Structure formats: structure tokens, C-alpha cells
């Protein structure tokens, strides 16, 4: 059981009720001292305030103190306080009843009532003990969300739970610097640190036990007060004698009585005695020391009541009361024993307040701020008032219903009488200067407050008020600086201090200097000395009749008065006055003491000396009719003039004041002012700076700008809410919405995953279906294709299937690739208009050597030939196919080195190097299950066989002519067919402006001159036949068709109008048309006939010298002279320009063409015996724009737009770009990088058409494309440098798109 009894808490409704004397539940009092001092202090200070260190005896008191009274506590959570926490988290947890042990206990009344001071914060129930309340709160589990994992205790806050867990884990990070003790909480460490402090100022007067606070001592004194009961005093004293508290704490010596123990401590252990620095209350009979007056009085009544009847131990004089005895003892005190000065202060005598003698006054004046007073002069003591003593005076002071008095040095101690207060002051505060107690009626100096009180009762209360007024000196004091007249010196001093305190800067501290002869006040020391020297040089002996007025030795006194206290204390320095105001008037600014002194002096307390004098003046007026005035004349002390009336004398004094008083000048600008108020306003202007601030209406903070104020409002006065998008509920914190999401919207759902393919399913049925279709039906097929996911039973089938994913047959006309040769053949027939001849039977045995040779030549041509050069041949996207390739026989993959091919076969097909027989065997097994009945080819799938059968049946015709309804296999053939429906074939003139068109270039240029023919929905219209075309290619076909008919018009007319149009033949490589089939070289491969022009054949020869034209093949050719003449004739008739057969570049004259051939194509110049090939005269699709036909430079760099003569120069130029700038080309608009300028240009084209629905329109001819690279190819082929729209302002470069210009400017010209 703990030594500290659980005190019964006070009622919450009556906080001022006293504690009951009876103990609760029969708990016995136990004053046994605990062996561990640290545990004792922890037990005592368990109800201590952490902010102000004040100790309380119950939980309700400290709770009320923290909420309402403590100034150092700002929003403290009561639950976080150690005194309000759970029993396990408190140092005195052993005093509480654990909830686990109180399950069967009776809580008593659970509904609220006057006797149950502990209400529940969650419901309406209340309890009589804190332990019952704590146990009950555990039942509110919905209000206490945090649970201890060790003991399952519930908490309201997480911090309380974490603090409680430290008691289980033993986490003690707060270590004592004096010893090895460690604690888990900082407040426990603070309580422990008090054990190391040896200063315990509060000691029990009975058992001499020390305490750290007055509240702990007060709680301890309740134990001794209960021992004073008559029926229990004997037994309690006997019980106390049996306790261990009678042992000395230093030497363990035992004593029978506490008085003996106290004497022992005072004699043998003076360092532990309470009179180390001050004396205690001492008994006049046995000289025993006491701290409390109640202990002293009880001691004298119980011990010395029968020995002596209040007689003096020095002179044997007897008194009726103890107060008179102690008052008499003051007369035996020697002046040498008092530690004070012998120089009295005149002003101090006048300012001692009479209000201090009233019972209701509180002597709360700091003695350190008092002026030192003179020792009291022995006076004849007044007569005794035995008849006036009441019966209550003889009883103990502790039982009298008297008002209490407080000490001016230790405000917490209370005294029932002035006599005991005087004993306390002389015994406990000898080091403090003694006050002078002055009677305001007769100015008699009394040594103590008790003597002053007795003097007032005996002398001035027995007289008639009229006599008191007549006994007062009839003297009137006049102010030397104005016409104010007062009745006493105190009022005059108050008037000068308040009204004339700031006469000049030298007297700023309210210094007042009074003459000791005439009591005239001066503002400076020099003016006072001059007054004494001139006026009182022979009048040094003239004084008033009062004995006090003859004692001063120092003529100059500086005084400072507090205008906020009721008793108007005075001070001898400004520092002491400031200290007094800071300690006793915290809520009043110090500056108000000087600024508003004049105003506050008018509203003094009724108990102040000035108010008393004013009251006396009113009494005199009531008795005598008017205050007494000095008889005789008014003499001026400056010039000696005499006046019979006061008004004339005051008028005369004003003339002296104007010359004597210093002028009020500004210290900054030396400007003069008539009064102090105007001077103060003017000086304030020098020190004032007007600034504008923006003030927050909520917290009154100031800001210099509106932005700072708005930022403050957003940060401090804006509430951030969190809304759940699922249920639209609003929360005030992030933690709350996280908890809401975790509770309301976190539903568990099972996901079923297949362990074989890692697919997830929401229900088990879907998983079963997946296993049935994908794993049960294909158990035998373990080989799976990585491209399409199809499974096969053997590895051979998988390898055969993989070949379908490789496109090794490439079409060099349009750069498309195909898996099989039959698909390539089909593409050539439908898209590129091969010769319309029947396919020979695939089943024929053998082939002539000539056919095989042509087949090899065509295969080489398809793989190595390139398109004719145009303006964009110098781009980095051209593929170099001259390097030999090594192909895989199984999947068709090609590699540049044989070792790479071997690694591929080993890695992908498990074929080691040298296993040729195995390869053949595998090749034999690679046969499909689907066989063609026509050519006996096998296929692996039905779709492949169906596509193959279509090649035997003919091409599929999907495109229908809207005029005649005929179907065609490709859009190109449909376009050529639609041209035949035109009726304006012979004119070749524009049907809008009737302008004759002579060439394809003129036709295309003229179409751009009629923008009204463009339609965004249907496309263009031909200016000759007015048919609608949907693309630029179709328009070019129209131009070729119309211009071709125009050039052949004369020949047709000579043969007759009934003759049909001659059939044209196209080259399979460059798509040029020729009138005769003999102009083409015929090649036959796999039963498909192909025709190449002479230029394409020469180009293939230059690329592959081993390829020759088959012997017997009809090679058309003419002599050089004949060719030149023919060309010249053509130029005259048709106006056509010559074109180079190798590079397809046109020239104005034949000489330029020959010069070009000699310089550029020197290796292709034929011998003299050979004949010059005929250059085709008609081209359906010109490779360069008309603007580029006049230029000789045909190669242009995309990066810097430089133009070169041949391919070699531009390749070197591009290589230099790559060396200098690298392969990374960055787009400055989106920071993406590309490895070539062509890709960057295509990317910039996409930037230009962002948000256009995926369409790309040519900025020159307005052709629409669905891919950016197609538009780029169109610009390269159809438009030249002159067609570029956007010019750079800082360099000569031009661009087709604005995004190209922006990227160029940011890259090249940005600073």
C-alpha cells in the first residue's frame, strides 16, 4: 500500500470546499518516511504542473489549474499530462486500481450527482474515484481506437499509446545527469531531478520535514491538524511517537518528541536547520523555533499557558494578550541590531500609507524598492485599552474569524494579526531594511505596524473629528511653478511629479528636489542649491515643530512613486520603480507610467495619502467653513515683493516663471514651444515614420505587401479538404481519407492466375475454360511460335512455320517485302503492270539455258538495281545492297558474314557447322500438307494455298470504273482506263483559259494556276478533260496521256482518222513508255515476261559487270549522229528537252548532255563501234520539278541545303556532317533525338500537322497524305528549292514547313 493516501477530490461544482477530515474507505494515515528519497518525491509531485512546477493535492485541482489558471500552459492536452494518463504510464501507478483488477468491484452510483466528481468524457456517467473512471472508459472501444499490443489497453491518441508502450519495452532515453537513473518520459526526469536539489524551502513546523512547494506542505499539514482534535489528540500523538519520523535523517538518532528532534538538528546539524539564512519564530519562554504562527500560538497555549501569564522575560511586565507582549518586546531591541541607515528621508516619512494599517489591506510592497528609513525615536507608549479587549482575543489565533495579513517579502504566508506579522518580519527578514511607519495626523514616527495601529486606536480614535482637524497644522503649500495650492507636502510632491515631470530633458526621470527649510520643490539640483544659498543663508535653524522634521541630514532627496498601487509606494531609483511595475503590474506598459502620469494622478485610490488629505480638507470645510489660510501678507521668495491677496501674488509669480523656467526647445531643430504637450507632438514627428501594412483580420499579423498577406491567409487560414471520388464524402485530413479508403473501399477480390501462361482471371470458370482450350487440347504441341503463339508438335513444323514470318522477297519498285515468290509475282502483275502474257505451265519439265540465264539476270536485277536518281538521292536512308548476303535456308534470315549465319543456325535451329546432310534432310521434311493441283507446290495452311490458286485464276479485280463499270486489279490501271473516256484528246488546251499546253511540266504548272478547280473533298480536276482526280499521281497520268496524244496528233492525221491509237509498252524498272516492243529488252523468269529499257539495262551492267544481255535478245540502238539528229528534230517539233539515260537529268542542248556524259558517266561511254542507245522521249512521271530542270546540281543535303553535282560529293559531305555533329539530331520543340536529318524532318512534319486528324497536306500542291513519310517523299520528288515557303531571316536557307524554320532558328541562331 502506498504511503500517500488517496485524497478525496473536491466537488467539481464547489471548488472552494474544504477537504473532509475523515478518511475514505477506512484508509489509515501513514506518515512513515520512505527509504528511497527519489520515490518519495515522485509520489509527492505526481500532481505537479510541468509548466509552473506548482503542486496540487488532487487530479481535479491540477486539471482546473492547467485549463484556466496556468499562464505557462498553451493548449496542453490533459491526456498527455502524466497526472492524467493511465495508471501504467504514471510514476505512481501503484496507487491506481488497474482495470483488470477492478472487474468485480462496485462502482457505486454511475449516474451523475453531486458526490461523483469524475464524469466520463464519452457518456453521462460519473464516478467517485479516478480508477473507476479509467476502468469505465475502457468500455468505450469505439472512442479509443489505439490499442496496446502488450496489455490490450485502449487509448484515445496515438501519442498516448506510444508513450505507454515505452513502459513495456523499457525504452528510457531520458538520462539523469547527476546519477545513473533513466526514464522513458521527460516529465518523470524533471520530477526525479528535484531529488538532487538540496533546497527544500517549505518545512513542517512539527516534524521538520522539507517540501518543494507550499501545496505539498499544506497537504502534509492536514495530517497534523487532525491530531489537534480533543478526543484523538492523545492517541494520535502516541501513534506518531511510534513512527520512524522521530529519527534524525543525518545520524539516525531517535527522539521521543519532535521538539527534541528539532533541537538536535539545530545544534548538531546546523546545515540542515531552517535558520541557515534567516531566523524563525521563537518562543519567548523556551526559545523554541517555529515557522508557522499557528504552531507558535498552539505551543504557547498548550505548553506555557499555566506557567506565565504573558509576562516579559526581561522586565517581568505582564500583558493580557500575546500581541501586546510582543509589542512590548520591541522596546528592548537595540538599534545596533537593526541593519539600516541612520539618515532619514523626509519624503519617505510623508509617503508611508495609512492604508497599510487597515485589516483588509495587502502589504504587497517590495521592500527592496523602499527608501531606507531612520531608526525609530523612543516615544511614550499610549495607555492600555484593557476594557476594549474582546473575548476572542484570548483564544487561539487559528480559531478566530479574523482577516489575514500577508508579508511583503513572502506573499504566500498569512498572519492573523499585525503583532505576529511584526514578529515574522524581525525574525525572518532581518536582512531587509526596516520601514518607517508614520502617523498621518501627527507625523509621529512609530517603530512597527503594531505600534502604529495601537497609536491610531488610542490617540486619534478617542478624539472628536473637529479636534483632530484643529490639531493638524494649518499650513498651505503652494507650487513654485504654477498657482496650485495644496495642504501638505505629500500632495505637493505628487503635484510636481505629475504636472511638471518633463520640464526639460534633464529632469526626464521625474526627479524632485525639495528644500529642507521651506519645503519648496525644484526640478534641478542646481536650482535648489542656488535657492538655499540665496534665501536660507541665515535661516538654517528655522524648522517646524515636528520632531521628525529636525532629523534630516541630507537636504536633497530623489523620489519615484508608483501611481498604480493603492498605498502609493515610493522608490529612490528608477530601476527599482521599473522592477516594481514589472513584478506587480505586468499588464500595464511601463511607458504609461511616464506618458499618462498626469492623468492617472487625478484618479487615486481612496486609501492613498492624497485622498486622505483631500478628505481632511473636506472635513475642515464642513467644520470650520473654509480651510485655514496663513495670516499676513504673501512674500515673493525671488524679489521680496509683498502682496495681500493670493491672486495678485500668483500673477506676480508667473512673471518670474517666464524668466526662470527654461524654454521648451526641440533637441532636433531647436524650435521653441509654449508647453510640454506641443513639444511632445513636435518631437514625435522627428521619430515617426509612416508605413503601410496589411493586417490579417484573424490574427492581427502585419505584412508589407498584399502577396505576403495572401500567402499567409492561404497557409494559416485556409482549410484543405479531401474528397473521396468514389462516394463524394469530404474529410479534413489526409489520414482520415486514407482510413476511409482502407475501410470502405478496400474490398478483397480473388484473382485466379494460370501458372503456365501467367494470365489472370476474375473467376474460376474463366480459368477452367482457358485451361480447357489452351492446355488440355494442345498437350502434344509443346513447340510454340514466338511471333503468333501457334503451337506445333515437332520442332521441324515450328521451323517451317517460322519461315512464314520472314519476308525475304523484296520489290524494288515500291520497297515492299513478301514471304513467298508467288506473292511477289502477284504484286508485280497487279501493281506494276507487267506484260499481259499467259503464265507458262508450271509443270513443264526442264528449261532452256537461255531462260535460266535470264532468270538469274532478273533475280540479280531485282536485288541490286536501284531507282533512278532524283533530288533526294543523297539522304541517309538509302540502303547499300552491294555487300554479299548469306541467307538461312530455313527461315530466310540474311547476314553479311558466314560466321553470323552459322551462329544463327546453331542458336535458332540447333544446326551445327558442317551438318549439310542434316540440313538437306530437314529441308526434305519441310513440306506442307496442302498441295496445289496445278503446279504441285505444297503449303502449310489453307490460306496460303488459296492465295496461290488465285495466281492461276488471274488477279482479283477490286477497282471498278464509275463510267463504264469495268473492274481493274489496281488503282493505277483504273486511272489509266479512266483517261480513255476523255473526249478532249486532240486539243491539249486548257478548257478554262484555252491556253495550249506543250509538255507535262507545263500541264502540272498550269493546273496550279486554277485554284478554283481544287476541292477538299473530291481532290483535283484535270484542266483538259475536266475529270476529277483523287491524287497527284492520277493528275500526272492525265498530263502524260494528254501531252502524248498532242505530240502524236500529226502522225495520226496522216494515217487517217480511222486508224486506232498505237499501243505503248512500259519498262518494268522505270515505268517509261515506248511505242514499240522492240525498244525493250525482254527477260523471262518463272514464266513471267519482263521488259527493261536500255537505260535500266546499262544501269544494271554498271552495278553488276558480270550481267550481260542475253545473246539473241533484240537490243535496239541507233548511231550517235542519227540519235542526235532525231533528238534535235524532236526538240523542234515537240519542244522536248534532252535527258541523260543514266541519271535521268534533262539538259537544254545536246552539247550539255554530251559534256555531262563525258564528265559524269565516263565509264559508260560506249566504244566507237557501238551504237548509242536511244533516249526515251516520253516519261509519264518526271523525276524532278520544272523549277529544277534548269539546274545542273541534282543532289541536295537536307541538313544545310547545299546542292552538289554528283553522288560522291554529297556522300563525302554527309560523312563530314556525321563526323562533326554525330548521329544525334535533336528536335528543339520536344527534345527528342533522331539518328538522321531525314527522320528529324519527318518528325517536324508531324509537328506541323498536330491535331489535324492524322492527315498531312503538301504546302505547295495541297496533296493530302495519311503518313508523314509519304508527304516527305512527295516533296523530294515533286518540288524543288524555289517552292519552299518559309525563309530564314538570318541565313539564306528556306523551308517547306514553319516547324522546320523554328527548329532551325533554335538550333543555329539561338544565343
Swiss-Prot record:
Residues 1-10 have a biased composition (Basic residues). Residues 359-370, 387-397, 1168-1178 have a biased composition (Polar residues). GO terms for biological process: neuron fate commitment; regulation of transcription by RNA polymerase II. There is a cross-link at residue 1146 (Glycyl lysine isopeptide (Lys-Gly) (interchain with G-Cter in SUMO2)). It is found in: Nucleus. The modification Phosphoserine is found at residues 546, 605, 608. It comes from the Eukaryota. Residues 1-37, 81-108, 349-397, 863-882, 1168-1188 are annotated as: Disordered. Predominantly expressed in hematopoietic cells. Present in organs and tissues that contain stem and progenitor cells, myeloid and/or lymphoid: placenta, spleen, lymph nodes, thymus, bone marrow and fetal liver. Within the hematopoietic system, it is abundant in CD34(+) cells but undetectable in mature peripheral blood leukocytes, and its levels rapidly decrease during the differentiation of CD34(+) cells in response to hemopoietins. GO terms for cellular component: nucleoplasm; nucleus. The record marks 72-73 as: Breakpoint for translocation to form PAX5-ZNF521. GO terms for molecular function: DNA binding; protein domain specific binding; zinc ion binding. Transcription factor that can both act as an activator or a repressor depending on the context. Involved in BMP signaling and in the regulation of the immature compartment of the hematopoietic system. Associates with SMADs in response to BMP2 leading to activate transcription of BMP target genes. Acts as a transcriptional repressor via its interaction with EBF1, a transcription factor involved specification of B-cell lineage; this interaction preventing EBF1 to bind DNA and activate target genes. Belongs to the krueppel C2H2-type zinc-finger protein family. This is Zinc finger protein 521. It comes from Homo sapiens (Human). The lineage of its organism: Eukaryota, Metazoa, Chordata, Craniata, Vertebrata.
Amino acid at each position: 500500500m502506498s504511503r500517500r493516501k488517496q485524497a478525496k477530490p473536491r466537488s467539481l461544482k464547489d471548488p472552494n470546499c474544504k477537504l473532509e477530515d475523515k478518511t475514505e474507505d477506512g484508509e489509515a494515515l501513514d506518515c512513515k518516511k520512505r527509504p528511497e528519497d527519489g520515490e518519495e518525491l515522485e509520489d509527492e509531485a505526481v500532481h505537479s504542473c510541468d509548466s509552473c512546477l506548482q503542486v496540487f493535492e488532487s487530479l481535479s485541482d491540477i486539471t482546473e489549474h492547467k485549463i484556466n489558471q496556468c499562464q505557462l500552459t498553451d493548449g496542453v492536452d490533459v491526456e498527455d499530462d502524466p497526472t492524467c494518463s493511465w495508471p501504467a504510464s504514471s510514476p505512481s501507478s501503484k496507487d491506481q486500481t488497474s482495470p483488470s483488477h477492478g472487474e468485480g468491484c462496485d462502482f457505486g452510483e454511475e449516474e451523475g450527482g453531486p458526490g461523483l466528481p469524475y464524469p466520463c468524457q464519452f457518456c453521462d456517467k460519473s464516478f467517485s474515484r479516478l480508477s473507476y473512471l479509467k476502468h469505465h472508459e475502457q468500455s468505450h472501444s469505439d472512442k479509443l481506437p489505439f490499442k496496446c499490443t502488450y496489455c490490450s489497453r485502449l487509448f484515445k491518441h496515438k501519442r498516448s499509446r506510444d508513450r505507454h508502450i515505452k513502459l513495456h519495452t523499457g525504452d528510457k532515453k531520458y538520462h539523469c545527469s547527476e546519477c545513473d537513473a533513466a526514464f522513458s518520459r521527460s516529465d518523470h526526469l524533471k520530477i526525479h531531478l528535484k531529488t538532487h536539489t538540496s533546497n527544500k524551502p517549505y518545512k513542517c513546523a512539527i516534524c521538520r520535514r522539507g517540501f518543494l512547494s507550499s501545496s505539498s506542505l499544506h497537504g502534509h499539514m492536514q495530517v497534523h491538524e487532525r491530531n489537534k482534535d480533543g478526543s484523538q489528540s492523545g492517541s494520535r500523538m502516541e501513534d506518531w511517537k511510534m513512527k520512524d519520523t522521530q529519527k534524525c535523517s543525518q545520524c539516525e538518532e531517535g527522539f521521543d518528541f519532535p521538539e527534541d528532534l528539532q533541537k538536535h538538528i539545530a545544534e548538531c546539524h546546523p546545515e540542515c536547520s531552517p535558520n541557515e539564512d534567516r531566523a524563525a519564530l521563537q518562543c519567548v519562554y523556551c526559545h523554541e523555533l517555529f515557522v508557522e504562527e499557528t504552531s507558535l500560538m498552539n505551543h504557547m497555549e498548550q505548553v506555557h499557558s499555566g506557567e506565565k501569564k504573558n509576562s516579559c522575560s526581561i522586565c517581568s511586565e505582564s500583558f493580557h494578550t500575546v500581541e501586546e507582549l510582543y509589542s512590548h518586546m520591541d522596546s528592548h531591541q537595540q538599534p545596533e541590531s537593526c541593519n539600516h541607515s541612520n539618515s532619514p528621508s523626509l519624503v519617505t516619512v510623508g509617503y508611508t500609507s495609512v492604508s497599510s494599517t487597515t485589516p483588509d489591506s495587502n502589504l504587497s510592497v517590495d521592500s527592496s524598492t523602499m527608501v531606507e528609513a531612520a531608526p525609530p525615536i523612543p516615544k511614550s507608549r499610549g495607555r492600555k485599552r484593557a476594557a476594549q479587549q474582546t473575548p476572542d482575543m484570548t483564544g487561539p489565533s487559528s480559531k478566530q474569524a479574523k482577516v489575514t495579513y500577508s508579508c511583503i517579502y513572502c506573499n504566500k504566508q498569512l498572519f492573523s494579526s499585525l503583532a505576529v506579522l511584526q514578529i515574522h518580519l524581525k525574525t525572518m527578514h532581518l536582512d531587509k531594511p526596516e520601514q518607517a511607519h508614520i502617523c498621518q495626523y501627527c507625523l509621529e514616527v512609530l517603530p512597527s505596524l503594531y505600534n502604529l495601529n495601537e497609536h491610531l486606536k488610542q490617540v486619534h480614535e478617542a478624539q472628536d473629528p473637529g479636534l483632530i482637524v484643529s490639531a493638524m497644522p494649518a499650513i498651505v503649500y503652494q507650487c513654485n511653478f504654477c498657482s496650485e495650492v495644496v495642504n501638505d507636502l505629500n500632495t505637493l510632491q505628487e503635484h510636481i511629479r505629475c504636472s511638471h515631470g518633463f520640464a526639460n530633458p534633464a529632469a526626464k526621470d521625474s526627479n524632485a528636489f525639495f528644500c529642507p527649510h521651506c519645503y519648496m520643490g525644484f526640478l534641478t539640483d542646481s536650482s535648489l542649491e542656488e535657492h538655499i544659498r540665496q534665501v536660507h543663508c541665515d535661516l538654517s535653524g528655522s524648522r517646524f515643530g515636528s520632531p521628525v522634521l529636525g532629523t534630516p541630514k541630507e537636504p536633497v532627496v530623489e523620489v519615484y512613486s508608483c501611481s498604480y498601487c493603492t498605498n502609493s509606494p515610493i522608490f529612490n531609483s528608477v530601476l527599482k520603480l521599473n522592477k516594481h511595475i514589472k513584478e506587480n503590474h505586468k499588464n500595464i506598459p511601463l511607458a504609461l507610467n511616464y506618458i499618462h502620469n498626469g492623468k492617472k494622478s487625478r484618479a487615486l485610490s481612496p486609501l492613498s495619502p492624497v485622498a486622505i488629505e483631500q478628505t481632511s480638507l473636506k472635513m475642515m470645510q464642513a467644520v470650520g467653513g473654509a480651510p485655514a489660510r496663513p495670516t499676513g501678507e504673501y512674500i515673493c521668495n525671488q524679489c521680496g515683493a509683498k502682496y495681500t491677496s493670493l491672486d495678485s501674488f500668483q500673477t506676480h509669480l508667473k512673471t518670474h516663471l517666464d524668466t526662470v523656467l527654461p524654454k521648451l526647445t526641440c533637441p532636433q531643430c531647436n524650435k521653441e514651444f509654449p508647453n510640454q504637450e506641443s513639444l511632445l507632438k513636435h518631437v514625435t514627428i522627428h521619430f515617426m515614420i509612416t508605413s503601410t501594412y496589411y493586417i490579417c483580420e484573424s490574427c492581427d499579423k502585419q505584412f508589407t505587401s498584399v502577396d505576403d498577406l495572401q500567402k499567409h491567409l492561404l497557409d494559416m487560414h485556409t482549410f484543405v479538404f479531401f474528397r473521396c471520388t468514389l462516394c463524394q464524402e469530404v474529410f479534413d485530413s489526409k489520414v482520415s481519407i486514407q482510413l476511409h479508403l482502407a475501410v470502405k473501399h478496400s474490398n478483397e477480390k480473388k484473382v485466379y492466375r494460370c501458372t503456365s501462361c501467367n494470365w489472370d482471371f476474375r473467376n474460376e470458370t474463366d480459368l477452367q475454360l482457358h485451361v480447357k482450350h489452351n492446355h488440355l487440347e494442345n498437350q502434344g504441341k509443346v513447340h510454340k511460335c514466338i511471333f503468333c503463339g501457334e503451337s506445333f508438335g515437332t520442332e521441324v513444323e515450328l521451323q517451317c512455320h517460322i519461315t512464314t514470318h520472314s519476308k525475304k522477297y523484296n520489290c524494288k519498285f515500291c520497297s515492299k517485302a513478301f514471304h513467298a515468290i508467288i506473292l511477289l509475282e502477284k504484286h508485280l502483275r497487279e501493281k506494276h503492270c507487267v506484260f499481259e502474257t499467259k503464265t507458262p505451265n508450271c509443270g513443264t519439265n526442264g528449261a532452256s539455258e537461255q531462260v535460266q540465264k535470264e532468270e538469274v539476270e532478273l533475280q540479280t536485277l531485282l536485288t541490286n538495281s536501284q531507282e533512278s536518281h532524283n533530288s533526294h538521292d543523297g539522304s541517309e536512308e538509302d540502303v547499300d545492297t552491294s555487300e554479299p548476303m548469306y541467307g538461312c535456308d530455313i527461315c530466310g534470315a540474311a547476314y553479311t558474314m558466314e560466321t553470323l549465319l552459322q551462329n544463327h543456325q546453331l542458336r535458332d535451329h540447333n544446326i551445327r557447322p558442317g551438318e549439310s546432310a542434316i540440313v538437306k534432310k530437314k529441308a526434305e521434311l519441310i513440306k506442307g500438307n496442302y498441295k496445289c493441283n496445278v503446279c504441285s507446290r505444297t503449303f502449310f495452311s489453307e490460306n496460303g494455298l488459296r492465295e496461290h490458286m488465285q495466281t492461276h485464276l488471274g488477279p482479283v479485280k477490286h477497282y471498278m470504273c464509275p463510267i463504264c463499270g469495268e473492274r481493274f486489279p489496281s488503282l493505277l490501271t483504273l486511272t489509266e482506263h479512266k483517261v480513255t473516256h476523255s473526249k478532249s484528246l486532240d486539243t491539249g488546251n486548257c478548257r478554262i483559259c484555252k491556253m495550249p499546253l506543250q509538255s507535262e511540266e507545263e500541264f502540272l504548272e498550269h493546273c496550279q494556276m486554277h485554284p478554283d478547280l481544287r476541292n477538299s473533298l473530291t481532290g483535283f480536276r484535270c484542266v483538259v478533260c475536266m475529270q476529277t482526280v483523287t491524287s497527284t499521281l492520277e493528275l500526272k497520268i492525265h498530263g502524260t496521256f494528254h501531252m502524248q496524244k498532242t505530240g502524236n496528233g500529226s502522225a495520226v492525221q496522216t494515217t487517217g482518222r480511222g486508224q486506232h491509237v498505237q499501243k505503248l509498252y512500259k519498262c518494268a524498272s522505270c515505268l517509261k513508255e515506248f511505242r514499240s516492243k522492240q525498244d525493250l529488252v525482254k527477260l523471262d523468269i518463272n514464266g513471267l515476261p519482263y521488259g527493261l529499257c536500255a537505260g535500266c539495262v546499262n544501269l544494271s551492267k554498271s552495278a553488276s559487270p558480270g550481267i550481260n544481255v542475253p545473246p539473241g535478245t533484240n537490243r535496239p540502238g541507233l548511231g550517235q549522229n542519227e540519235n542526235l539528229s532525231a533528238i534535235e528534230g524532236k526538240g523542234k517539233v515537240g519542244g522536248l528537252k534532252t535527258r541523260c539515260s543514266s541519271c535521268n537529268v534533262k539538259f537544254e542542248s545536246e552539247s550539255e548532255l554530251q559534256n555531262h556524259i563525258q564528265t559524269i558517266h565516263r565509264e559508260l561511254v560506249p566504244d566507237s563501234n557501238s551504237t548509242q542507245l536511244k533516249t526515251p522521249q516520253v516519261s509519264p512521271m518526271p523525276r524532278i520539278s520544272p523549277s529544277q530542270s534548269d539546274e545542273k546540281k541534282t543532289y541536295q543535303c537536307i541538313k544545310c541545303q547545299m546542292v552538289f553535282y554528283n553522288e560522291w560529293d554529297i556522300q563525302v559531305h554527309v560523312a563530314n556532317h556525321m563526323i562533326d555533329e554525330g548521329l544525334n539530331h535533336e528536335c528543339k520543340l520536344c527534345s527528342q533525338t533522331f539518328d538522321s536529318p531525314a527522320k528529324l524532318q519527318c518528325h517536324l512534319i508531324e509537328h506541323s500537322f498536330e491535331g489535324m486528324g492524322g492527315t498531312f497536306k503538301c504546302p505547295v500542291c495541297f496533296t493530302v497524305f495519311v503518313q508523314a513519310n509519304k508527304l516527305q517523299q512527295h516533296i523530294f520528288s515533286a518540288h524543288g528549292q524555289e517552292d519552299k515557303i518559309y525563309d530564314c531571316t538570318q541565313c539564306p536557307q528556306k523551308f517547306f514547313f514553319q516547324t522546320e524554320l523554328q527548329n532551325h532558328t533554335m538550333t543555329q541562331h539561338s544565343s
